[in-house]
Amino acid sequence: MALLKVKFDQKKRVKLAQGLWLMNWLSVLAGIVIFSLGLFLKIELRKRSDVMNNSESHFVPNSLIVMGVLSCVFNSLAGKICYDALDPAKYAKWKPWLKPYLAVCVLFNIALFLVTLCCFLMRGSLESTLAHGLKNGMKYYRDTDTPGRCFMKKTIDMLQIEFRCCGNNGFRDWFEIQWISNRYLDFSSKEVKDRIKSNVDGRYLVDGVPFSCCNPSSPRPCIQYQLTNNSAHYSYDHQTEELNLWVNGCRAALLSYYSSLMNSMGAVTLLVWLFEVTITIGLRYLHTALEGVSNPEDPECESEGWLLEKSVSETWKAFLESLKKLGKSNQVEAEGADAGQAPEAG
């Protein structure tokens, strides 16, 4: 028994074809939107690729770009099919291809849904990518004279200013690395010598942060150095003082930015997916309604359209059976090829 059977007369078939034609061209515009979102995300990721781990993947933006292009192609073709469906002579040339085309549309909808899920699930991989990338970026902050790394200081400073953040997880991350280049250290100074000798790795570590960590909204002049030394500053207690530095770490700030971006893109892609599913269902009804016309010479006659020719369970069983037959035929062909090679070897 057919699933979700609907009766169509000529007027209903024409309205369905016209409605699907309009929806397909709207979906072409939606495909352009998805393509644009993927391109925008790719550009945003590349802009900050210097503070991301090298293993950072562009799978999601690339997938959005591909899905956007495919959406434009498939829906343009579907729009042409719906337009020609109004003319029996023109529809005849599409008739043999419509069923395979619907199967491709189902696969496209599955792929689009998976890409939508990836948009919402990207946060986990992005978090580890940012953690490693920012850590390495801060490590190279001082290498202003090293080719290939001389830009890192500007990159980190601009990042901290733009996103109002400091360090990887917080401002104390700067205490654990030497962010001042040896070029600007006076090695004849006793303080510099003592600091380097007191460190196992021979690094010059200070309880200070770069200028880009300063919050300009603070009424107090920025305290960059000796942040943990209360006596170095008037009326200051680092444990209770609300520091005039950015409180948030850059990993959390970037993660929040990209997560909101990905959630918005995921929501848009989900709406487009629902729209595409609706179009595919409509195409299925149009296909079965036109196939069910008993007398092609009488376009006014009624016909029946359905979503599935059989029930869900019967359709699933038939699908599994077809897979088994396909597997057996491949196995027989492989055995035949092996048998043909054996006499040649003899």
Curated annotation (Swiss-Prot):
The residue spans the entry assigns to the Lumenal side of the membrane are as follows 44-61, 124-264
- GO MF annotation terms: protein homodimerization activity
Membrane-topology annotation of the record:
Multi-pass membrane protein
Q: Does Transmembrane show up as a keyword for this record?
A: yes
Any idea where this protein resides? Answer: Membrane; Cell projection, Cilium, Photoreceptor outer segment; Photoreceptor inner segment
Sites carrying sugar chains: N53, N229
Superkingdom in the source lineage: Eukaryota
Keywords attached to this entry:
Cell adhesion, Cell projection, Disulfide bond, Glycoprotein, Membrane, Sensory transduction, Transmembrane, Transmembrane helix, Vision
* Chain ranges passing through the membrane: 25-43, 62-80, 100-123, 265-290
Topological domains annotated Cytoplasmic = 1-24, 81-99, 291-346
Task: Offer one example of a GO biological process linked to this entry.
Answer: protein maturation
| CDD domains registered for this protein in UniProt | peripherin_like_LEL
A GO cellular component annotated for this chain's UniProt record is: photoreceptor inner segment
Chief localisation class: membrane
Region (Interaction with MREG) residue ranges read 341-346
In the record, the note on similarity to other proteins reads: Belongs to the PRPH2/ROM1 family.
Subunit details = Homodimer; disulfide-linked. Forms a homotetramer. Forms a heterotetramer with ROM1. Homotetramer and heterotetramer core complexes go on to form higher order complexes by formation of intermolecular disulfide bonds. Interacts with MREG. Interacts with STX3. Interacts with SNAP25.
Tell me the function of this protein. Answer: Essential for retina photoreceptor outer segment disk morphogenesis, may also play a role with ROM1 in the maintenance of outer segment disk structure. Required for the maintenance of retinal outer nuclear layer thickness. Required for the correct development and organization of the photoreceptor inner segment.
Q: What is this protein called?
A: Peripherin-2
Q: Which organism is it from?
A: Canis lupus familiaris
Q: What is the lineage of its organism?
A: Eukaryota, Metazoa, Chordata, Craniata, Vertebrata
